[in-house]
């Protein structure tokens, strides 16, 4: 399984982007539009294995809810995956958001692709 690592600043930017996206306002800044696009692409690109689309959408929304509202896996209800898998998917989701926002450079993208 691949390891997805973000440094502290990248993680803070991604979490802020998700929180801003969860509280959409009428006026959108360039950052907000970029974040919304990156989040939509990350939701589509998240690899949660070969499961039904209904279950996949629940997992993706629980990950989004976990980041947006700071909720732990234990308080999210039925997530259709165990705790370890959930947090691995969450890391992957954050990495995809950061990558889609342009925070990840090519060198790090290649390192992540090697797995670990």
Regions found by a protein language model. Give the residues of each.
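Amphipathic alpha-helical interface surfaces
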Residues: 35-38, 59, 89
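N-terminal interaction/assembly modules
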Residues: 1-53, 106-116
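Short, solvent-exposed secondary-structure capping/transition elements
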Residues: 72-75, 99, 106
């Amino acid at each position: 399984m691949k390891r997805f690592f973000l440094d502290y600043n990248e993680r803070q930017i991604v979490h802020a982007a998700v929180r801003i996206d969860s509280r959409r306002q009428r006026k959108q800044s360039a950052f907000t539009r970029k974040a919304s696009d990156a989040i939509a692409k990350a939701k589509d690109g998240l690899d949660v294995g070969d499961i039904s689309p209904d279950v996949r959408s629940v997992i993706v929304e629980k990950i989004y809810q976990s980041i947006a509202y700071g909720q732990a896996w234990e308080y999210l209800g039925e997530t259709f995956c165990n705790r370890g898998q959930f947090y691995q998917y969450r890391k992957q989701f954050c990495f995809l958001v950061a990558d889609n926002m342009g925070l990840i450079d090519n060198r790090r993208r290649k390192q992540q692709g090697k797995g670990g």
